[in-house]
């Protein structure tokens, strides 16, 4: 169905209530969550700004993918979570008014030290990508302090993703980023 949406693009708008009804009906089937997230991502791409009214319907199930015990390292669940991060990037500026719901999920994922490296890196890269589409000025502290903690304790691959994301946040926040520099310098000095 995601391929079909990719072909017909914005012409799917007339069928959105039915499509979202189908998505919500099938969501509890864990085996279908990855294809459903792919479908939602395709809808977000096809409709762009017209997708915004549907976000309140689809965000709760997407965020629910991150609920439950974090200890559970299930490959299928990790793939679905990574696809949800891709969907967040696809939603772009449409997601801005829901950042108060989305950011805690992303932060919790990249802060989790036992999490899969690929998933943690994807969460950090999601913040990086969103920083080019949405205004994080009201959420800077909630994002940057956990990033600094991750910078302090992670493997090199995750640390490099954190540094890239911090650079993107410097560009977006400009002089407002200055308040975080002493904290970063303190951690950077310890990491050397």
What does each of the following model-derived ranges do?
Residues 1-192:
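Karyopherin-beta/Importin-beta family HEAT-repeat alpha-solenoid scaffold
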């Amino acid at each position: 169905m995601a391929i079909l949406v990719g072909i017909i693009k914005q012409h799917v708008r007339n069928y959105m209530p039915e499509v979202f009804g189908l998505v919500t009906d099938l969501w509890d089937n864990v085996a279908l969550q990855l294809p459903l997230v792919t479908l939602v991502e395709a809808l977000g791409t096809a409709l762009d700004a017209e997708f915004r009214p549907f976000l309140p319907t689809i965000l709760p199930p997407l965020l629910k993918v991150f609920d439950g015990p974090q200890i559970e390292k299930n490959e299928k669940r990790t793939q679905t979570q990574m696809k949800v991060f891709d969907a967040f990037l696809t939603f772009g500026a449409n997601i801005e008014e829901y950042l108060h719901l989305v950011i805690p999920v992303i932060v919790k994922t990249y802060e989790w030290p036992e999490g899969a490296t690929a998933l943690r890196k994807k969460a950090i890269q999601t913040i990086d990508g969103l920083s080019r589409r949405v205004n994080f000025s009201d959420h800077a502290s909630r994002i940057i302090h956990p990033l600094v903690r991750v910078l302090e304790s992670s493997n090199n691959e995750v640390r490099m993703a954190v540094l890239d994301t911090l650079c993107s946040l410097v560009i977006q926040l400009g002089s407002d980023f200055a308040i975080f520099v002493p904290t970063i310098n303190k951690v950077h000095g310890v990491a050397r």
